[in-house]
């Protein structure tokens, strides 16, 4: 069996400028634990997971915001709405990158190895630079359960 046999084809993805608040709502609504972040051509550029939503400390967020405020405010008039938006992180701010991906022909054994080696829970399936599916650990477990029992010799 390969990725194409077990992958979820209806992939929920987000753009890099999607606010994290919207991503959190999407994860809850769709009952998923992570989404690929795609560029304008549909190519994966990162992943955002539940861990990214809760794993960043307040100090990290404040340090990032302070850096941007200092950089932008030095001698330049800055749009107040833009400054306010800096307190709302986007997918670009929080995603894990670069994205690790596979193709449709990747075997289930290889996928399991990739998930284990990189300590990730899902991997996008890419064809011609675009996401065509996603394989999660749950997909691998379903495939394992669906296999016919082979009696011991």
Residue spans for each PLM region:
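Tandem CBS (Cystathionine beta-synthase) repeat/Bateman regulatory domains
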Residues: 1-153
């Amino acid at each position: 069996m390969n990725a194409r046999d077990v992958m979820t084809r209806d992939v929920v993805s987000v753009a890099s400028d999607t606010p994290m608040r919207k991503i959190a709502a999407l994860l809850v609504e769709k009952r998923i634990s992570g989404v690929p972040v795609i560029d304008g051509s549909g190519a994966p550029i990162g992943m955002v997971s539940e861990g990214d939503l809760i794993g960043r400390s307040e100090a990290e967020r404040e340090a990032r915001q302070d850096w941007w405020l200092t950089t932008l405010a030095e001698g330049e008039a800055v749009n107040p709405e833009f400054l306010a938006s800096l307190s709302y992180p986007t997918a670009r701010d929080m995603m894990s990158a670069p994205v690790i991906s596979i193709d449709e022909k990747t075997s289930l054994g290889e996928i399991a190895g990739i998930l284990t080696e990189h300590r990730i829970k899902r991997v996008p399936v890419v064809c011609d630079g675009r996401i065509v599916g996603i394989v999660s650990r749950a997909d691998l477990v379903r495939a394992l359960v669906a296999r016919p029992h082979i009696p011991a010799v």
